[in-house]
Structures are given as C-alpha cells and as structure tokens.
C-alpha cells in the first residue's frame, strides 16, 4: 500500500485531506510538526508538506529530507503563491507545489502522478 506522509498543522485541512487520501486507498501518516514528520519520513512513498509549520519551516523539512539522500517525492502545500515562493520551494527539494485554496481532485491527481513517477510507472511520450 502506498503511504502518504501528510505534514499539515491545521486540522481543518489535515483531517479532510487524510480522509480523502484514505478513500483513494493510501495509508496516511499525519503530523502537525516538521520534527514529527522527519521522524517518520522513512517508508513514506510521498510527502505532502505544508510550508508554515509551528516548529520547523516546511522548506527546512524538505532540505533535511534531501540531505538524507532520500528521493521521496515532496509536494508542497501552501498559501504562499508568489513566483519566488514557488522557486524557493522547488529549490529546497519539492517536486511539485500546490497553493491553498486548492481543488481536491487536482491535488489527488498530482499525488498520483508523483507516486507513478517515483515508482517508475510513468508513461513515456
């Protein structure tokens, strides 16, 4: 089963997202802090990561994941929508970037695409 590590400190976002991922057939491990997420990053197939966390900034979490040599896809989920925020997020190690508010169907499609790419099942043009 594919495991989503959901890192979001706002229960109004994390709880419905966790349910949606569960309905899609994913195992979900949810954390509201960066430190908690870093303790559980091993074994995750994708990380859905908020930037504004109470302890460690999501950018730092992404950098630490990459510093460990992990290639787990990271999808940043944030209210920050400036072009510079997108660039900084991708440079920190994110594979994709979704701004809040988001459309659930699009977010789920992006997660599926990242999981496919990571597992080598992406269809080549």
Kindly give the residue locations of the regions a language model identified.
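N-terminal/domain-start alpha-helical segments
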Residues: 1-119
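Short, intrinsically disordered, charge-balanced linker/junction segments flanking boundaries
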Residues: 119-125
């Amino acid at each position: 089963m594919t495991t989503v590590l959901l890192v979001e400190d706002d229960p109004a976002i994390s709880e419905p997202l966790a349910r949606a991922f569960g309905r899609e057939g994913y195992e979900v491990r949810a954390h509201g802090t960066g430190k908690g997420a870093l303790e559980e990053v091993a074994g995750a197939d994708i990380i859905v990561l908020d930037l504004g966390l109470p302890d460690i900034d999501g950018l730092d979490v992404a950098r630490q994941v990459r510093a460990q040599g992990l290639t787990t896809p990271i999808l940043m989920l944030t209210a920050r929508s400036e072009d510079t925020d997108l660039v900084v997020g991708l440079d920190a190690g994110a594979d994709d970037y979704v701004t809040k508010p988001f459309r659930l169907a699009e977010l789920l499609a992006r997660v599926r695409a990242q999981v496919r790419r990571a597992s080598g099942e992406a269809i080549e043009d």
